[in-house]
Amino acid sequence: FHRQPLLRELKEMNSILEMLEHTEVVMIAGNHDYIKKNSYYRTFSWASHVHMICSQEIDCVELDRIQTAVYGCSYHSREIHDPVYDHAVPEGRQKYEILLAHGGDEKHIPIKSNQIMTLGYDYVAFGHIHKPQLLVENRMAYAGSLEPTDTGDIGRHGYIEGRITGKGCQIRFVPHALREYRNCEVKVDKSVTGHVLRQKITDMIAEQGMQHMYKITLTGYRDPDIWYELDHMDSY
């Protein structure tokens, strides 16, 4: 959640996750939905296959059916300045071991990718940054948010699909969000009238997709006698 969740929202989320029949779900709270004193996370009862790591210290969920241990911790405050993950060594509880982490900047658990890679996890799943980002090939990545949360979240959004076998870990980014925020540039010159500009924008959107949300920047120099009525440029 990008804020403190309401009880009804946890119930809705749990109801959706209950529909998963062959999946184990492991979650932690981040800096926006951190576990404060009266957080509903503290008392909520999740479905049997949904596991919430509420501890502010590194803890572990063991998933015997899939021979996997997931390590992580939840935020109990908006900021954590200590590099908590630097010494979060896996304990060898299961065949496969994953670190579920949140942060990456100086105010939210600073990280050093090289240091974390020396710990020995099969995979490190990071959250906090909204844009998908590969840190170490097939070993460490930010999945990003499933959907863009504000106009700054440009580009594709989706999830990371991974497979861990005896041969190692393989991951791939799967685009999933139907809509994107896109920043586009339209060049103008003295020959471009308001009508021509509107058609340029219309053609560009038709080519890239009407479902997306656009921020359009005009570059160049217009005829001083021409005035672009920007409120009338939306042709859809």
Task: Tell where the protein language model's regions lie, with residue ranges.
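His/Asp/Glu-rich metal-coordinating catalytic cores
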Residues: R3-R163
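Accessory, non-catalytic peripheral segments of nucleic-acid enzymes
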Residues: C169-Y236
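Short, glycine-rich nucleotide/cofactor-binding loops
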Residues: F1-P5, V188-S191
